[in-house]
Amino acid sequence: MVQTEPVVFFNGEIKPESLVGISIRDRGFLYGDAVFDAARTFNGTPFRLSEHVHRLYDSLRYLRIDPGIEPKEMEDWSRRVVDHNYKLLPPGQDMWVMQRISRGIEPILPGDVMRPTVLIETHAIPF
């Protein structure tokens, strides 16, 4: 089956964008306790992606957020999302690829463990 909907990477897996939801208890949503970076593409290739991911990980270290995946994996997943979603754009269009990592869902019960929320998404550049 041909996928006609954009996909995202969400917490370890590629999913259709419409099937992803962020918890109202996510610290990124509640308090802005998150880091993001964005790189644009040229002809479907992310521009200086490794530099962008390096900067993202510098910020994550500063805030002491462990995304649970290595920088190389973040790059690989970003490229996979771009590769899929770029095919859905009209000819000549490019996109942003964004990595968003929050500290995770606020624990509410004893024994709850906070794990990061990791999202990689794309948006068409509006020109």
Which residues make up each language-model segment?
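Conserved alpha/beta cores of soluble small-molecule-handling proteins
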Residues: M1-F127
